[in-house]
Amino acid sequence: MEIRLAKSYGFCFGVKRAIKIAEESPNSVTFGPLIHNKNEIDRLKEKYNVELVEEIDEIQENSRVVIRTHGIPKEKLALLKEKNVEVIDATCPFVTKPQEIVSKMSEEGYSIVIFGDINHPEIKGVMSYATDPIVVLSVEELEGKPLKEKVATVAQTTRKFEEYQKIVNYLMEHKKEVRVFNTICNATFENQDAARELSREADIMIIIGGKNSSNTKQLFKICKENCPDSYLVENAKELEKEWFEGKKVCGITAGASTPNWIIEEVIENIKKIQV
């Protein structure tokens, strides 16, 4: 069986930056998961004593607090800054961008439409910088929503571009003025395009990443559209021998929060599978 890697996959700029910040801040805490990859979070704890905390009340005075890549709501950031702690901001710059955009557009009187998952930490952070934002995942969710005649729209950095286009087209058809900010990350574009291309050539796709990672789930969705035998795994232990029976080309891609050491372990384990 031939194993092919996608042309673009794995750690993005924002995640690499956040991991470096955490490694250079031993004995610190992260407010929320730094990235959506449990294996890497466990490694940071074991090797650098970087602890995960979910609530501000859990943070001790004089702590060093690393802000997660997804950012946090501005109210929580303000509360942190009121405490006697050192705040180290590892928010991805590509996530900070939509925060700044919705803040400015709200001040200028635009209705704000955010394309993304309202329960995702990145979107919760972006929402906090906007006035009465409307968050949707589809045109159907947008229909009937109260909007001014001038609208500004941003997207979650890890969503599918084609789905964002549908939102934008709907707004352009129904509103007089629409300011469109394409805030989907370039790394997301590249990884998705590479996954799409490879999944058309493979008869099995393995997508490596956290099951709670938005960008990894998008990769899985894209691969599944082209290759029905697509599987999302967090690590090599989740591989099943029977998946590979009769397969000739195994394609591999990985989410933006997936470290190389996990990808290499998965590849080595696939090589050992004899079917």
UniProtKB/Swiss-Prot annotation:
HAMAP family: IspH
Record keywords: 4Fe-4S, Iron, Iron-sulfur, Isoprene biosynthesis, Metal-binding, Oxidoreductase
E.C. code: 1.17.7.4
GO MF terms, alphabetically ordered: 4 iron, 4 sulfur cluster binding; 4-hydroxy-3-methylbut-2-enyl diphosphate reductase activity; metal ion binding
CDD domains in the record: lytB_ispH
Pfam families: LYTB
Binding site for [4Fe-4S] cluster: 12, 92, 185
Catalytic machinery residues: 122 (proton donor)
Protein's recorded name: 4-hydroxy-3-methylbut-2-enyl diphosphate reductase
Keyword check for tRNA-binding: no
Cofactor detail note: Binds 1 [4Fe-4S] cluster per subunit.
Purpose: Catalyzes the conversion of 1-hydroxy-2-methyl-2-(E)-butenyl 4-diphosphate (HMBPP) into a mixture of isopentenyl diphosphate (IPP) and dimethylallyl diphosphate (DMAPP). Acts in the terminal step of the DOXP/MEP pathway for isoprenoid precursor biosynthesis.
NCBIfam families: ispH_lytB (TIGR00216), PRK01045.1-1 (NF002187)
Domain of life: Bacteria
Pathway annotation: Isoprenoid biosynthesis; dimethylallyl diphosphate biosynthesis; dimethylallyl diphosphate from (2E)-4-hydroxy-3-methylbutenyl diphosphate: step 1/1; Isoprenoid biosynthesis; isopentenyl diphosphate biosynthesis via DXP pathway; isopentenyl diphosphate from 1-deoxy-D-xylulose 5-phosphate: step 6/6
Cofactor(s) annotated in UniProt: [4Fe-4S] cluster
